[in-house]
Amino acid sequence: MELIEVNFNDEGDIIDTLSGKILKDTPEERVRQRFINILQSDYGYPKNIIAREVPVQQGSKILSSDDGAEIRADIVVYTSKKACLERDQGNILFVVECKKPNATEGYSQLVSYIFNTSAVGGVWTNGNGISVYKKKTGGEVGLDEILTLPRYRENWSGSDSIPSKSELPRPHNVRFLLSSCHNKLYGRGMENEDFDLAMDMVRNLLAKIQDETTPGEFPRFWITENDFQTAEGRKHAATEIQKLFREYADQFPD
C-alpha cells in the first residue's frame, strides 16, 4: 500500500486513519498517525488488527493515573481481527508508545504496558527514531532491545537466516528510516570528538548501494538478530560494511 500522510479536515483537525474520527492536532498525535501508517505500509500489519488509545488493565482493573484518568496505550497491535474488535488484552502482540518529536521519556510507560498485557514486546518512537524491545526468555524478567520491528507474521525470537536480495522488503517511508539511522549514529558518536555524522551517513548509504548493485544472491549489508546481541557479531557486520564502502570508493577514486 502507499504511505498515507496525516489527514486533516478543513478546520485543521486530524482525521484518524483507523476510525475516521476527528482528533485534535497535536505533535504527539501526528507521530501516532504516521506510525500507524508505517505499520501498514512498511511492516505489513493489517489495519483491522491495529487500535489507537487502548485502556490497559491490571488484572480486572483498568490502570489509572494519579488524577484518576484511564491509562491508555498509544497504539496496540493484536494477534487477530477478532481480538482487536473485542479489545482482548490476552491477545495483544505488541504495544507502541508515541512521543512528540525530540522527546526522550516514555520507556517506563512502555514497560508497564508490556508486562500488564500478553504483549511479546513493544515499540518506542518520537517520529524521528524507533526503539524495539521484546520480553526476555528463559524465565528472566525484563526486556531486550532488538534490532528491528518484525514484519507481520515474522517471528519475534530472531533468526540466523539471511533473506535473498529478491526477498528484501521495499520501504515506503525512507525519510523515517534515514531519520532513525541518523539518530542511532548521533547517539553512538556523541562521545567521539572526531565523529563526522554526515560522512558516516554517506558511507553507509554508499555501502548499501554497492551491496544492492553488485551480483550475489544474498546481501552482505546485513546483521542477524543473534549477531546483533554480541560484540563479535556487531564487529563482523561493521567490517563487512566497511569493505563494501571501500569497494565502492575504489570504483570512483576521485
Where are these regions (language model features)?
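Non-catalytic, mostly N-terminal accessory regions of nucleic-acid modification and defense proteins
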Residues: M1-D254
